[in-house]
Amino acid sequence: MNNIRKIHPLVKIINSSLIDLPAPSNISSWWNFGSLLGICLITQILTGLFLAMHYTSDTMTAFSSVTHICRDVNYGWLIRYLHANGASMFFICLFLHVGRGLYYGSYMYLETWNIGILLLFAVMATAFMGYVLPWGQMSFWGATVITNLLSAIPYIGTNLVEWIWGGFSVDKATLTRFFAFHFILPFIVAALAGVHLLFLHETGSNNPSGLNSDTDKIPFHPYYTIKDILGALIMITILSSLVLFSPDMLGDPDNYIPANPLNTPPHIKPEWYFLFAYAILRSIPNKLGGVLALVLSIAILAVIPLLHTAKQRSMMFRPMSQCLFWILVADLLTLTWIGGQPVEHPFVVIGQLASVTYFTLILLIMPITSMIENQLLKW
């Protein structure tokens, strides 16, 4: 009798993706983040579903409904903080996943990489709209500032912003539609993640050496299932510690003040995972220029495969490129720090320098360095 996992139409898809999938024998823990992102997404959808059962998307009751969840619903505080900090874990895993792709040249799988960029944009949009829902001060003003950026688009800008707002300011209509979008987007993200995997399994996984690994494959189960479970346990431990010991560490205290359109907070800033892009936005004095730089700070990932001038795929054997990669990481951490600082000297100048460094490194210095390394190979 044939094994059911190999003949059943549905089960055999799962089998070929998670059990009998041929995987390179040398992939490191940096390849764990795909499965961790899947776990994050499932956690976010489940906790979000339970929150949506008690949340009301009305300006008068949104804030108090979140309070009600935390105070009166059984383990409501746990669900709410798992959801809020789960988003932070999601972005930590996302950034590490993208960083891994950059370091080991995984961006050479073009379809997988481009779907990944789409996923990143979709997750960022979801997180932004989710931050608006508790209707605290930072929710309201964050929504006002970020949506207002669209008014920089020539000719249609103002109409577009008012169309998104559903009025002349961020109000009930805005909150209701953001809740609707925030509810539907994670399912679109899940569908895109399926397509992401579909394209990945067309080519097979990359590996740290960047070489073709067809001659040396091992089955995904049990080798990488057990490895992924270990990664998941570590992530769950970190998330649980964060939720149970310091759930508000990554949040903004201003969001515990109900939204007040008449009172602007001294420093409007988004969640920590958007600060690097926010710093790039603020470092350009022109509104339209800032918006373009903001979009390009993520969209630049799409041109990275075109800028791959090296003869080797991975950075594993390219020490000069490795140095530049870690300078880029340090630069992004600097931008994240600057994004959370007030707009005053010396932070403005540091932000501008870090922004220029970010784009110059990716567009100019790294491709040129790769070409130099190609010449060094001949020695």
UniProtKB/Swiss-Prot annotation:
One of its GO terms (biological process) is mitochondrial electron transport, ubiquinol to cytochrome c. Its main location: mitochondrion. InterPro entries: Cyt_b/b6_C (IPR005798), Cyt_b/b6_C_sf (IPR036150), Cyt_b/b6_N (IPR005797), Cytb/b6-like_sf (IPR027387), Cytochrome_b (IPR030689), Cytochrome_b_C_euk/bac (IPR048260), Cytochrome_b_N_euk/bac (IPR048259), Di-haem_cyt_TM (IPR016174). It is found in: Mitochondrion inner membrane. Disulfide bonds: none annotated. It comes from the Eukaryota. The cytochrome bc1 complex contains 11 subunits: 3 respiratory subunits (MT-CYB, CYC1 and UQCRFS1), 2 core proteins (UQCRC1 and UQCRC2) and 6 low-molecular weight proteins (UQCRH/QCR6, UQCRB/QCR7, UQCRQ/QCR8, UQCR10/QCR9, UQCR11/QCR10 and a cleavage product of UQCRFS1). This cytochrome bc1 complex then forms a dimer. Heme 1 (or BL or b562) is low-potential and absorbs at about 562 nm, and heme 2 (or BH or b566) is high-potential and absorbs at about 566 nm. PANTHER family: CYTOCHROME B (PTHR19271:SF16). This is Cytochrome b. It comes from Crocidura wuchihensis.
